């Protein structure tokens, strides 16, 4: 059983969204138990590590889980992992696989990053240009198939090889970008969120284009001997090719 259902975009009704996300995870686990499924696959997120100035260059699966408290998507992903681990302790026969993925990119991408680059003017943070990771949508599908056929279990970070910076992304997609001071952009983002001018994110989302939050995929390579077809750069390029 593969659990992918999740509220991706932030909402202003945090309690309701949390209930949908966490109850959805519990329902999926119950379905796996009732159907006597052999394997449960959960698509988590590298955002659960949080974007912080003291992050190491590469975050591994044993790094601290510290999602930004106001970035609900990451908070609920981390809470869902906890529910799954608790369930696993009482259901030893079920193979549980947790995939902590970076943003999925490709021709059909629809996430907070892809939407930012579809706007007439791209906003950047002055003096900040962190490396980003992406995984191509085809690589996600291929990995799921590999995991099911081989009944893989455990927790793995997944991301395309290498990184690409925010400014490099803007050049590839030929976006007009303006860089604002961090304090000003944070203020404008928070005001526009509170006044409902925009519904993408409160100011906590800006940390993900301010600080590094790159995840190591060494465990995936060494334990499973698995390699993705697309790098982070080429995954982004396929999105650009579709949009330009």
Feature names for model-found ranges:
Residues 1-23, 51:
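NAD(P)H-binding glycine-rich loop region in Rossmannoid oxidoreductase-like domains
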Residues 2, 41, 97-99:
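Hydrophobic structural elements of the Rossmann-like NAD(P)H-binding subdomain
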Residues 16-27, 35, 75-76, 135:
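Glycine-rich NAD(P)-binding loop of the Rossmann-fold in SDR/ketoreductase-type enzymes
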Residues 19, 53-98, 103:
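Catalytic helix-loop patch of NAD(P)-dependent Rossmann-fold dehydrogenases
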Residues 26-72:
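Conserved Rossmann-fold NAD(P)-dependent oxidoreductase catalytic core, especially the SDR/UDP-sugar
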Residues 87-133, 137:
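NAD(P)-dependent short-chain dehydrogenase/reductase
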Residues 141-201, 217, 236:
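Mid/C-terminal beta-alpha module of Rossmann-like enzyme folds, strongest
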Residues 219-222, 229-244:
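Amphipathic terminal alpha-helices
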């Amino acid at each position: 059983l593969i659990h992918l259902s999740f509220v991706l975009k932030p909402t202003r009704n945090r309690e309701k969204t949390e209930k949908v996300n966490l109850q959805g995870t519990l329902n999926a686990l119950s379905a796996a138990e009732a159907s006597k499924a052999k394997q449960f696959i959960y698509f988590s997120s590298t955002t659960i590590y949080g974007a912080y100035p003291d992050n190491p260059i590469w975050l591994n699966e044993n790094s601290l889980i510290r999602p930004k408290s106001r970035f609900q998507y990451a908070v609920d992903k981390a809470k869902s992992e906890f529910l799954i681990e608790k369930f696993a302790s009482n259901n030893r026969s079920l193979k549980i696989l947790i995939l902590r993925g970076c943003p999925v990119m490709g021709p059909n991408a629809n996430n907070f990053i892809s939407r930012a680059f579809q706007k007439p003017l791209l906003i950047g943070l002055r003096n900040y240009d962190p490396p980003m990771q992406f995984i191509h949508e085809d690589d996600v599908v291929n990995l799921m198939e590999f995991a099911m056929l081989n009944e893989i279990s455990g927790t793995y970070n997944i991301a395309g090889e290498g990184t690409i910076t925010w400014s490099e992304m803007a050049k590839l997609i030929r976006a007009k970008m303006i860089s604002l001071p961090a304090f000003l952009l944070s203020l404008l983002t928070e005001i526009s969120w509170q006044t409902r001018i925009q519904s993408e994110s409160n100011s906590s989302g800006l940390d993900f284009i301010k600080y590094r939050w790159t995840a190591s995929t060494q465990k995936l390579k060494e334990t499973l001997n698995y390699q993705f077809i697309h790098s982070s750069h080429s995954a982004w390029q396929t999105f650009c090719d579709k949009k330009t």
